[in-house]
């Protein structure tokens, strides 16, 4: 055991924030950056009209539309811990990026709108978190507005998601009548709007407010005490072992917009969340985070994070060992040696050169085309390969071509870089070599078209081809004559053949005609 390295690893907290769109995910990210001293003021959703955009929404289209379509990666120091926070897209069309991001974290923070409760995208993302077996912490947001009963919100976690919710604090009122938060662990109340000269926190004795405090004889506070009594009688008690096993979620209430309850949440989160742990490698081995040899995997590639430089960043989750500038690593996919001279991390929108990084850290590598999403990198003689990252089979397809044939170079450069990010997938018509894009949702095409024009000066024509089902075929079984008016024969960017069918009926027709041919949803 390398004790010095392990001490560094144990100070890391690497987590993703997940939610349904508009639940306040980006706002709580901003408030955490504010608490970490990375930014001086948080950009709110309202401020988007004035041009003060959220720090973690860096892409121009995100600023214009007020949505997150990429995963932002940010780091800061807080209470002696190194925080690596990944703000993920809430929009379902970009769930593939979110799923990959969840492979790179040790915990998740689930933000829920207290007026709406658990929404469809939250359910989908929670399912992935559960499959990964990582702990999830719940933040019931928007307490500054009227919402559902807190007892109902906690009960819904078990009813809908099948996870035990344990309240760590409890609201005293909500909306216009919000008075404060009862911190159950520390037996104190955090006041929502303390008067001038008044302490923000009021210590409680045996659950009772001291005489002369704003809570003394307050009917709303008395009602809260009754709810807590009910909760403690019927609910489960906090069990960190269950939390780490993904069987129980600590529940915090607050308002990200007014920065109420966020600090208490972050303080308790850094204490309760796990440090980086072991990772599976080579199919059946466990790699310890304090293993001496450096290793990691690339979970995200992003072009043009700095439009002035037109560069590409490959994001690496460090899994073991220690990164240092100039480190020589092997790219497992090719066996090629790569020297990591230029690595950065992100503090808000600023880039900071990385001199060292350990397990749990997220490092951005300047990429000239060496890396692909899912690549494993390692130093040392022992080959280390991490499990493949999840891939979605597209359900929407569009033919794409440049509007100006004189700008083929810009078109091909933009196409290649954006496809390598993994948000859209590229296919070529088997006969004509036409370009076809595949995506999970329509918004991905809109973002592709927008970025081609604004980042690569290449306007594109996009037309739907009306096919919805993609199925790969073994090249040994392929006969080009199988292509018909009911399907389209294409090849993916690695040259593998597949058929695009208009619908499930067309696929069944193909199976009936060629019963011995095996088609697969993924290669």
Curated annotation (Swiss-Prot):
Cellular component terms (Gene Ontology): cytosol
Keywords: Cytoplasm, GTP-binding, Nucleotide-binding, Protein biosynthesis
Protein origin, superkingdom: Bacteria
UniProt-listed Gene3D superfamilies: P-loop containing nucleotide triphosphate hydrolases, Peptide chain release factor 3, domain III, Translation factors
Domain tr-type G intervals: 10-277
Subcellular location: Cytoplasm
Residues that span the membrane, as ranges: none
SUPFAM superfamilies, per database record: EF-G C-terminal domain-like (SSF54980), P-loop containing nucleoside triphosphate hydrolases (SSF52540), Translation proteins (SSF50447)
InterPro entries found in the cross-reference section: EF-G-like_DII, EFG_III/V, G_TR_CS, P-loop_NTPase, PrfC, RF3_C, RF3_dom_3_sf, RF3_GTP-bd
Entry's Gene Ontology BP terms: regulation of translational termination
Positions with a binding annotation for GTP: 19-26, 87-91, 141-144
Keyword set includes Cytoplasm: yes
GO molecular function, one term: GTP binding
Pfam families: EF-G_D2 (PF22042), GTP_EFTU (PF00009), RF3_C (PF16658)
HAMAP family on file: Rel_fac_3
Cited function: Increases the formation of ribosomal termination complexes and stimulates activities of RF-1 and RF-2. It binds guanine nucleotides and has strong preference for UGA stop codons. It may interact directly with the ribosome. The stimulation of RF-1 and RF-2 is significantly reduced by GTP and GDP, but not by GMP.
Family: Belongs to the TRAFAC class translation factor GTPase superfamily. Classic translation factor GTPase family. PrfC subfamily.
PANTHER family: PEPTIDE CHAIN RELEASE FACTOR RF3
Protein name: Peptide chain release factor 3
Organism: Lactobacillus delbrueckii subsp. bulgaricus (strain ATCC 11842 / DSM 20081 / BCRC 10696 / JCM 1002 / NBRC 13953 / NCIMB 11778 / NCTC 12712 / WDCM 00102 / Lb 14)
């Amino acid at each position: 055991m390398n004790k010095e390295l392990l001490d560094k690893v144990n100070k890391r907290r690497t987590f993703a924030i997940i939610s349904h769109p508009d639940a306040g995910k980006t706002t709580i990210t901003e408030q955490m950056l504010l608490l970490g001293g990375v930014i001086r003021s948080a950009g709110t959703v309202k401020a988007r009209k004035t041009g003060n955009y959220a720090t973690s929404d860096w892409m121009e289209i995100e600023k214009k539309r007020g949505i997150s379509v990429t995963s932002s990666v940010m780091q800061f120091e807080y209470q002696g811990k190194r925080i690596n926070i990944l703000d993920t897209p809430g929009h379902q069309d970009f769930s593939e990026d979110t799923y990959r991001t969840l492979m790179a974290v040790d915990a998740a923070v689930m933000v829920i709108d207290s007026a709406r409760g658990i929404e469809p995208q939250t359910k989908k993302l929670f399912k992935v978190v559960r499959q990964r077996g990582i702990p999830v912490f719940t933040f019931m947001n928007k307490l500054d507005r009227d919402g559902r009963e807190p007892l109902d919100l906690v009960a819904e976690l078990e009813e809908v998601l099948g996870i035990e919710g344990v309240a760590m604090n409890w609201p005293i009122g909500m909306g216009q009548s919000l008075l404060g938060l009862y911190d159950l662990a520390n037996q104190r109340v955090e006041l929502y709007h303390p008067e001038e000269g008044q302490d923000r926190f009021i210590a409680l004795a045996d659950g009772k407010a001291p005489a002369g405090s704003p809570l003394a004889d307050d009917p709303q506070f008395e009602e809260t005490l009754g709810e807590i009594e009910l909760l403690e009688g019927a609910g489960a008690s906090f069990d960190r072992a269950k939390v780490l096993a993904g069987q129980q979620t600590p529940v915090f209430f607050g308002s990200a917009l007014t920065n109420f309850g966020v600090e208490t949440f972050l303080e308790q989160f850094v204490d309760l969340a796990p440090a980086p742990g072991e990772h599976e490698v080579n199919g059946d081995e466990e790699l310890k985070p304090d293993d001496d040899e450096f290793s990691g995997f690339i979970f995200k590639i992003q072009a043009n994070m700095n439009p002035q430089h037109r560069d590409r960043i490959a994001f690496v989750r460090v899994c073991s060992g220690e990164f240092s500038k100039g480190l020589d690593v092997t790219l497992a996919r090719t066996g090629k040696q790569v020297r990591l001279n230029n690595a950065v991390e992100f503090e808000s929108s600023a880039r900071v050169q990385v001199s060292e990084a350990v397990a749990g850290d997220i490092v951005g590598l300047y990429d000239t085309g060496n890396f692909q999403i899912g690549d494993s990198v390692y130093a040392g003689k022992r080959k280390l390969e991490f499990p493949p990252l999840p891939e979605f089979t597209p359900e929407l397809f569009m033919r794409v071509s440049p509007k100006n044939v004189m700008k083929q170079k810009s078109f091909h450069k933009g196409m290649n870089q954006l496809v390598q990010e993994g948000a859209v997938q590229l296919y070529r018509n088997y006969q004509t070599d036409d370009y076809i894009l595949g995506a999970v949702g329509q918004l991905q095409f809109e973002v592709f078209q927008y970025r081609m024009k604004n980042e690569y000066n290449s306007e594109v024509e996009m037309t739907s081809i009306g096919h919805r089902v993609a199925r790969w075929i073994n090249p040994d079984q392929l006969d080009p004559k199988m292509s018909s008016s009911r399907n389209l024969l294409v090849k993916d960017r690695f040259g593998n053949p597949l058929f695009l069918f208009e619908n499930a009926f067309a696929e069944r027709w193909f199976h009936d005609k060629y019963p011995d041919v095996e088609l697969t949803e993924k290669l």
